[in-house]
Amino acid sequence: MNNITKLMKQKNILTPPLPLYRRVLRAHRYHLGAEERALGDEYVKAEFRRHRNVTNPLHLVGFLSSWERYADALENESWKQEKYSNTDLLESLNDQQIGQLYELSKALQEQKKSE
């Protein structure tokens, strides 16, 4: 994290979209494996493209602050220690989302077995 980013955090100033976009892609490059990076880069590019013409200030603040938290988590590697056993979250999912989560879990397990 450079000095400007630290100063912006101290003053609770949001990072402008383009530097934030670059920061997230850089974090992917340094902290993710090749497959995760490819998937993450594709998702980040699509999300920033979708939000390019958003004019609602509240939506922009939410969008940028969420991506800043994501970049912070990647850079601090705090995401590796997190455990996702939140039963409230699981209970809030609908049947389709639970099915998708199950399929994703199965695919990840199969991928680990093949490595």
Swiss-Prot record:
Superkingdom of origin: Eukaryota
Pfam families (alphabetical): Complex1_LYR_2
Record localization: Mitochondrion matrix
Keyword tags: Chaperone, Mitochondrion, Transit peptide
Annotated InterPro entries: SDHAF3/Sdh7
GO CC annotations on file: mitochondrial intermembrane space; mitochondrial matrix; mitochondrion
GO biological process, one term: mitochondrial respiratory chain complex II assembly
Subunit structure: Interacts with sdh2 within an sdh1-sdh2 subcomplex.
Known role: Plays an essential role in the assembly of succinate dehydrogenase (SDH), an enzyme complex (also referred to as respiratory complex II) that is a component of both the tricarboxylic acid (TCA) cycle and the mitochondrial electron transport chain, and which couples the oxidation of succinate to fumarate with the reduction of ubiquinone (coenzyme Q) to ubiquinol. Promotes maturation of the iron-sulfur protein subunit sdh2 of the SDH catalytic dimer, protecting it from the deleterious effects of oxidants. May act together with SDHAF1.
Family the UniProt entry places it in: Belongs to the complex I LYR family. SDHAF3 subfamily.
Protein name: Succinate dehydrogenase assembly factor 3, mitochondrial
Originating organism: Schizosaccharomyces pombe (strain 972 / ATCC 24843) (Fission yeast)
